Amino acid sequence: PWNRTDGPGVSLAVSIDGTTVSRQVGMADLEQGRPIDDGTVFHAASLSKQFTAFAILLLERDGRLSIEDPLARHLPEAAHLGPITLRQLLNHTSGLREQGSLLAAAGWRREDLVTDQQVLQMLLAQRRGNFPPGTAYQYSNSGYSLLAEVVRRVSGQSLQAFCQQRIFDPLGMRRTRFQDSLAALLPGRAQSYGPTASGHVRMPLNYAVAGPTGLKTTAEDLLRWAHNFTQPVVGDAALMARMREQGQVAGLAPGFYALGQERHPYRGLDTWSHGGRDAGFRSFLLRIPAADFAVAVLSNAAEVDAAALAYGVADRVLADHPQWQPATRAKSRPSRRQLRAYAGDYELFPALIFSITTDGRQLYFHTGQGSEPTALPAPSATEFELDPSSNLALVFEADDSKPASALGYRIGLNGTLTAPRIQLQPFQPDPQRWPELTGRYDSAELQTSYWLQIDAGQLVARHPRRPPIRLRPYQADTFAGSDGALQKVVFQRDAAGEVTGLRLDCPLAEGIEFVRNEP
């Protein structure tokens, strides 16, 4: 579907046993009529993280730092964020709030310019995190923004300059760089597009942020990078082993994340991968070292599933590999007891609740916002199809001896998010009491204010840089926002019952305090 001249497309490069082939289809720039070719430069989004991690390890090999160092050793002004180590930043166990959610809650819009310094200022303004460092895993762009700043402080160079000198140039990645300034010229760059009913529109990307994102590259350059893991030109065997060290939460076995890469078994083989998505850009790099195989997928179309393309190529190319195992799926059906164990309410993100019910024969899904329940087909006793066309599914542990403690929201081959079970209490909204919630609410951490008002019988939050956000009550003093900037709002009261403030929970950024002031 991408081999056309009226839509964005895909650049794909494959390496097997040292031989590389590539294919490009679609348009890099619809306005200029420029097709994608092997020199087209794409934004690689979160694929950037493994380069940032590698830069940190190069500095460790130089004796300039250790990944066991506390962050405050290199960024003293971050000491108040807690006893966070560089390793915890690398493996998403730091507990830092997510920078994207913080910026959105502070009033930043998708089309706004976002710079490294603005992100750093926002992160340093935080007074607490989502959890104590080292006690949980939670994906965090914030950690990699701070790692990029560590590279700058320790090396005396920007992340772009350091990587250009130490990684890109030695590997011959001539079309690769970190874009840390929107003023930088990038010949051959692809534009970003999203689908509409009649075609595509541009999706602006105004990041000048390097570290968690910001890498501009080609599919063939990514394969040069992939080859370096098995035949090092930059780094050595010890450094490559360091890159494979999977993160660990206290008291648990090592997780799947390892310094900008994910380790997953697939068809009987170990795979190392990472994807990315920003605006309309999609990326995925998959390595299967035992098969001497790598595939890089880059796209400027928001509807492309880059992970599915990458694994689909692996399925075709490696079908005859001696260790390759065909896909299998359990045929068992869920029992009534299992269905009862699965039924309940689960919170994927703050105030985003999946309600699962059963009639004893199958499961039903709804979001708890007046939506009609949807029957969930069950390919197996633990897997339920939410949207087969997008390969979205809900998965549960097989134990039926007690109610499930969580469900897994599987996003195709891109990974699985965990939604813990919650207990919703019987609740009846009382709009007569909403006036006591109005007023101005100020956040020192976000350096912003919201005005809460009653408008046409609804509680509405207003901000000078965002459209009005409707607040829908679903528990006592607890509201869900119509915009992710205010995803979940919980009002705080003193001993006399007076509203003193609110607590804001956003995706991956929780417990942000606002103080109430009178209108």
Residues of each region from the PLM?
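Active-site-proximal loop and beta-strand segments within enzyme catalytic domains
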Residues: R4, P8, I16, V25-N141, ...
